[in-house]
Amino acid sequence: MSIASIDRVAAQGRWRNRPLAEKCLIGLGFLALAVTVPPFPGAVLVTVAILAFTFLGARVPLRFWAAVAVLPLGFLTTGAAVLLIQIGPDGIGLAPQGPAKAAALVMRASAATCCLLFLATTTPAADLLSGLRRWRVPAELIEIALLTYRFVFILAEEAAAMTTAQRARLGHATRRRWLRSTAQVIAALLPRALDRARRLETGLAARNWQGEMRVLSTRPAASPLVLGLILTLQAAILAAGVLL
């Protein structure tokens, strides 16, 4: 799943025009809860709430979300499996408290991952950067982030074009050819990336770039009622996670 696909779904989604403050409060607020409240029931309640916002509120397609989540959740599962075993003088065995630690890790990290995926699939990067500008983040940092973000798309397009060309020439027919073709892509990607960066710099200079790239944003103001409801829900989950 490419970064461009995620940004496209966020730009075309149901919550595309929701105020940025509301989406950030949901994503970052629940993320803070996920890493602070006890894994059970706090992190579980965070996961349920953020998935409800994702699928029932924002209507993010389930199949697309699963395709995006499979890699981080798969990595999480592998990391949790390591906690189940230990290597000692007697060899490999089940670690004491291993299942409990693995379960706590899975619950807490899954909740945090779902929060970040909510923000990624509902908020385009341009909106996040324009929000940072309104929050008085230094313009230099915003411009570096914006140029880096756009350059990632350029690199992805270059790599995809090179891989497609290799497949058309049967460069992936066997495992040996695949390894050789992949090495060639990696070796050729850096010179192409530097060339594209040079052309990008020349284009910006030709347009009299003064160190700031403005992005048009017409987002409505956040509703105090909606913000209050979100905070109330988060406070309820915090209380449940601490008291239960």
Swiss-Prot record:
GO terms classed as biological process: cobalamin biosynthetic process; cobalt ion transport
Can you tell me where the transmembrane regions are? 26-46, 65-85, 112-132, 141-161, 224-244
Query: Membrane topology type, per the record?
Result: Multi-pass membrane protein
| The entry's keywords | Cell inner membrane, Cell membrane, Cobalamin biosynthesis, Cobalt, Cobalt transport, Ion transport, Membrane, Transmembrane, Transmembrane helix, Transport
The protein's annotated pathway = Cofactor biosynthesis; adenosylcobalamin biosynthesis
Give me the disulphide-bonded residues: none
What Pfam families does this protein map onto? Answer: CbiQ (PF02361)
- InterPro entries with a match to the protein in the record: ABC/ECF_trnsptr_transmembrane, Cobalt_transport_CbiQ, ECF_CbiQ
* CDD domains assigned: EcfT
List, alphabetically, the GO terms of the cellular component aspect: ATP-binding cassette (ABC) transporter complex
Taxonomy, superkingdom:
Bacteria
- Its main subcellular localisation, reduced to a broad class, is membrane
Q: Where in the cell is it found?
A: Cell inner membrane
Q: State the protein's purpose.
A: Part of the energy-coupling factor (ECF) transporter complex CbiMNOQ involved in cobalt import. The complex confers cobalt uptake upon expression in E.coli; can also transport nickel with a very low affinity.
Recorded family membership:
Belongs to the CbiQ family.
Subunit info here reads: Forms an energy-coupling factor (ECF) transporter complex composed of an ATP-binding protein (A component, CbiO), a transmembrane protein (T component, CbiQ) and 2 possible substrate-capture proteins (S components, CbiM and CbiN) of unknown stoichimetry. Subcomplexes composed of CbiMQO can be isolated from membranes but the CbiN subunit is not isolated in association with them, suggesting it is only loosely associated. Expression of just CbiMN in E.coli confers some cobalt uptake.
This one is known as Cobalt transport protein CbiQ
> What gene, per UniProt, encodes this protein?
cbiQ
